[in-house]
From Swiss-Prot:
This is Adenine deaminase 2. Gene3D superfamilies: Metal-dependent hydrolases (3.20.20.140), Urease, subunit C, domain 1 (2.30.40.10). One of its GO terms (molecular function) is adenine deaminase activity. Keywords: Hydrolase, Manganese. Belongs to the metallo-dependent hydrolases superfamily. Adenine deaminase family. HAMAP family: Adenine_deamin. Its EC number is 3.5.4.2. Its cofactor is Mn(2+). GO terms for biological process: adenine catabolic process. It comes from the Bacteria. It catalyses: adenine + H2O + H(+) = hypoxanthine + NH4(+).
Amino acid sequence: MTAQIRLAEPADLNDDTLRARAVAAARGDQRFDVLITGGTLVDVVTGELRPADIGIVGALIASVHEPASRRDAAQVIDAGGAYVSPGLIDTHMHIESSMITPAAYAAAVVARGVTTIVWDPHEFGNVHGVDGVRWAAKAIENLPLRAILLAPSCVPSAPGLERGGADFDAAILADLLSWPEIGGIAEIMNMRGVIERDPRMSGIVQAGLAAEKLVCGHARGLKNADLNAFMAAGVSSDHELVSGEDLMAKLRAGLTIELRGSHDHLLPEFVAALNTLGHLPQTVTLCTDDVFPDDLLQGGGLDDVVRRLVRYGLKPEWALRAATLNAAQRLGRSDLGLIAAGRRADIVVFEDLNGFSARHVLASGRAVAEGGRMLVDIPTCDTTVLKGSMKLPLRMANDFLVKSQGAKVRLATIDRPRFTQWGETEADVKDGFVVPPEGATMISVTHRHGMAEPTTKTGFLTGWGRWNGAFATTVSHDSHNLTVFGGNAGDMALAANAVIGTGGGMAVASEGKVTAILPLPLSGLVSDAPLEEVARAFEDLREAVGKVVEWQPPYLVFKACFGATLACNIGPHQTDMGIADVLTGKVMESPVIEVLG
């Protein structure tokens, strides 16, 4: 049974006066407020494309009727033969990944046809705790974009293996779940904790079940008994798919799938698997998860996921159904996801079913965008609470080196950028510090939230190419500590101090110079600058990092830098405490295994 999200908003459609007006307009006894004519309706129930006109009263669809049979309306929108679809619903995403404010994000996606997002603000939660989630709830007020918040379940994502800016237990989750803006528990990344009935994670899941709200998952690599156990605990969705086979296994298991666009190289495999079925399961929804600012500016949000899926061979009707009706059913929102009398008038008119360029966008019956431009003002929110998150002093070059006795050591290494595994190598020691092994990349993490001493912990990566500079970032999932990658300690200190000096963000240094910087003074995650400005700076960063290391797609890519500290994933990961391994639950404070001489 679909969890029913207890939100206040759907009640606005139950106003007796509104319903009376809608009934009268549907009968022809009074005119519509808005009439969309001349369009081809995308029927996400039957899969048909059929001519139809849509009459709207207030926020409510009053009538879907024969073309040109009515002309009585205060406002007429001529669709001109274009395709009329329900507004797109993004079932799992993080606004912070686009490095802009919710207001700027709304301006970017609403004009493209996205009318609802399900936002997990766990980046703000990991930096600011409950205050960060409270700010997110305030920031979405009165936006033309409907944002359903989820309560961050993993703050931090790997307790005991990393330290962030807060620690959410079941009591805090229960309080968050009582807020009307909160639609459920966000992706549960501590999979082992759920499966092994860790009291903390069991309590968090139970808080979601008791609130009768969604309990969303992060089931990377789970299968067979572990997957069943994860679901039996109460988790009902997943977006962490790694192959077409994984997709099919999780569909058969009964999970709701949030098919994400952030791993483009996997989408053709997913499309092939769905096409083999011959129908679209009702449990397939779509999400963006993470979209970088330059990608958002150039490609868009969920509209880009729909566009790419169709390009890879998915039927447009299927892609739209996944992004509308299936999503609404997942959310328990019977007012959304369908163009039918009695439903909410969240509507987008697409030019065609290939490029999915939005000609008109209506949100709750109000025209909010036309021709890719917003028609309404978007309110902003005070950001004072998000400032001042860099609670650490400037770094010295020696802070990034590993101390050791002797002349030679055996080191533990973190091998491969994805699906990491333990490795070993030998290295020389000079002046009390380990000399980085040939071909290894240093990764250093420094706690920045004031919850522990800001001691830098350094490890060694293999398979990351040869670095002739450094990249520093405070966007480092999920605790968002100061993380620096590099080939030498001098450039690492330079990049780190540039980031500290701007109150958080990203910087690249090479040969003793800072070559690119993106200030993110809000939480060390977000800028209050316009999307266009942030996107340009991020593009410059991509280019600058590409000059200090040679990427090897699909796994050794710029994006890998932001997930290298994700300690909840299987395998060794560097954190502010050392090299952490979620399977053993242990942290290796120094990579030095043994002094050899």
